[in-house]
Amino acid sequence: MHFRPLHDRVLVRRIDAEEKTAGGIIIPDTAKEKPQEGEIIAAGSGGRNEQGQLIPIDVKPGDRVLFGKWSGTEVKIDGQDYLIMKESDLLGVVDKTGSVKKAA
């Protein structure tokens, strides 16, 4: 199945957190927090301003993003868990070089 978000919404796949600490301690599933990092799978065309002009989305499929712990709506598509959220719920884009750039 193919899913295309509408307007300024994005489809995000969570990127799982590390299962071990830096010191080698294994973190059990019950103690893990929901990851706050994910990958953009699909993005809508953008929102509209008061004049009706299209405001394009700043993220694209493949971007790694950070978001709030309680952001988005959890959905299951083809057995895979995803989040659907507005672009404004994203905190920023993680650059592959390790630096962070701001999203709109």
Curated annotation (Swiss-Prot):
The keyword Chaperone applies. Induction: By heat shock. Keywords: Chaperone, Cytoplasm, Stress response. One of its GO terms (biological process) is chaperone cofactor-dependent protein refolding. It comes from the Bacteria. GO terms for molecular function: ATP binding; metal ion binding; protein folding chaperone; protein-folding chaperone binding; unfolded protein binding. It is found in: Cytoplasm. Its main location: cytoplasm. GO terms for cellular component: cytoplasm. Coiled coil: none annotated. Heptamer of 7 subunits arranged in a ring. Interacts with the chaperonin GroEL. Belongs to the GroES chaperonin family. Together with the chaperonin GroEL, plays an essential role in assisting protein folding. The GroEL-GroES system forms a nano-cage that allows encapsulation of the non-native substrate proteins and provides a physical environment optimized to promote and accelerate protein folding. GroES binds to the apical surface of the GroEL ring, thereby capping the opening of the GroEL channel. This is Co-chaperonin GroES 1. It comes from Bradyrhizobium diazoefficiens (strain JCM 10833 / BCRC 13528 / IAM 13628 / NBRC 14792 / USDA 110). The lineage of its organism: Bacteria, Pseudomonadati, Pseudomonadota, Alphaproteobacteria, Hyphomicrobiales.
